[in-house]
């Protein structure tokens, strides 16, 4: 009986590479000349530091574009509130790992709502989907990809 797992993982090595590339790009950008701005990689978080709120927003967009180049979904990125201390601003970015219980329930409800001949079960931080045919699992994969959920999902452990 074919089965697969739906998980939500982020490749932290690719995130680190994106942070390094973003730091390099900031040093060469004209709008950041003479400004103290940096990305700090504190696994699994990133701390953005700049002299102004507007620059933090630009840095966040820059980070998103670098993540997209490295094939890391920006939905996995959770941006915190900007905080000021003196003349410096900082903002923390975290990455969602695993599927929370509420999201897993929403995912199972979505799959069962399509009336496909599959069973979906929550197993910790992942959702196991089993069906009689491989085509049904592929239909579930397509359904999850097209659904407007605020988290990115990957499909692993595909067994025939």
Curated annotation (Swiss-Prot):
Annotated GO CC locations: cytosol
GO molecular function: nucleotide binding
Pfam families per the UniProt record, alphabetical: DUF520
Domain of life: Bacteria
Chain segments annotated as transmembrane: none
Stretches of the chain forming a coiled coil according to its record: none
Keyword terms of this UniProt record: Nucleotide-binding
Family indicated by similarity: Belongs to the YajQ family.
Physiological role: Nucleotide-binding protein.
PANTHER family, per the entry: UPF0234 PROTEIN YAJQ
NCBIfam families in the record: PRK05412.1 (NF003819)
Protein name: Nucleotide-binding protein CPS_1098
